[in-house]
Regions:
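Glycine-rich phosphate/diphosphate-binding loops that line cofactor/substrate pockets in enzymes
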Residues: 7-8, 166-171
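Residue-level signal for short, function-critical loop segments
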Residues: 51, 81, 178-180
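Internal gly/pro-rich beta-alpha loop/helix module
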Residues: 55-166
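Hydrophobic/aromatic ligand-binding patch that stacks against planar heteroaromatic rings
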Residues: 36-37, 94, 192
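ATP-dependent carboxylate-amine ligase catalytic core
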Residues: 1-41, 49-76, 84-89
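Phosphate-binding active sites in nucleotide-utilizing proteins
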Residues: 170-207
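Short hydrophobic alpha-helical runs that function as membrane-insertion/retention elements
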Residues: 45-48, 103-105, 201-202
């Protein structure tokens, strides 16, 4: 699996969820949701929430998320866009009301914002001062997250790599658009094509 291959040889693996935690196919199923992925792989979930304009209500929402499916796999909470003062106020209350540990917070960092557009984020090559922004984010993560407790969530058996079959000889050629306009490609997709015996050929629709 992609997870087993990517996690092999590393101390921890991160799987990023998208959309709402339980939002899956068609928006009416939990299949292919972040929860479904965690349930399939047996992963602990660090739920990132933004406490904007709410406090005790946030505890109610978290309890709902934690009880909506059994098991929920939610193992901890991270408060995003949160001040140190707000974190100090909310964390004890949320832990008492939900039974879930609050593992830290990330403050607002306007100077580290990476913009977005109607089709998603800008690519790395388009972001000005990307390395400086990443450094600011890394410093904030190091300072404001309880790393010992977070890493304790990762203490599980490493995934077992499946037996890799011999790559069959190339049978088909798959053309993949790649240029300034067509630059959002998942390396894992190309790898899967090649593993299945396809030859990947790049071309530019602009030229």
């Amino acid at each position: 699996t992609l997870y087993a291959k990517g996690a092999a040889g590393h101390g921890a693996a991160v799987c990023e969820g998208a959309m709402g935690f339980y939002d899956g196919l068609g928006g009416v199923s939990d299949r292919a949701s972040a929860w479904h992925l965690a349930d399939t792989l047996g992963l602990p979930v660090l739920l990132v929430v933004e406490p904007k304009g709410q406090s005790l209500t946030l505890a109610a929402e978290l309890k709902g998320l934690d009880s909506f499916r059994t098991p929920s796999h939610i193992a901890g909470i991270l408060l995003n866009n949160c001040t140190a003062r707000m974190h100090a106020l909310l964390a004890p209350m949320l832990e008492e009301e939900t039974g879930l540990p609050v593992l830290g917070f990330l403050p607002k960092l306007p100077e580290a914002v990476i913009g977005s557009r109607h089709l998603g984020l800008y690519t790395a090559a388009e972001v000005e001062n990307l390395q400086q922004k990443l450094a600011l984010l890394a410093d904030a993560v190091e300072e404001h997250i309880d790393w010992p407790r977070l890493l304790a969530l990762c203490e599980k058996e490493p995934p077992v790599l499946p037996v890799q079959p011999e790559t069959p000889p190339a049978r088909v050629r798959i053309a993949v658009a790649q240029d300034e306009a067509f630059c959002f490609t998942y390396a894992e997709t190309l790898e899967a094509f090649r593993d299945a015996g396809a030859e990947v050929v790049f071309f530019s629709p602009l030229r």
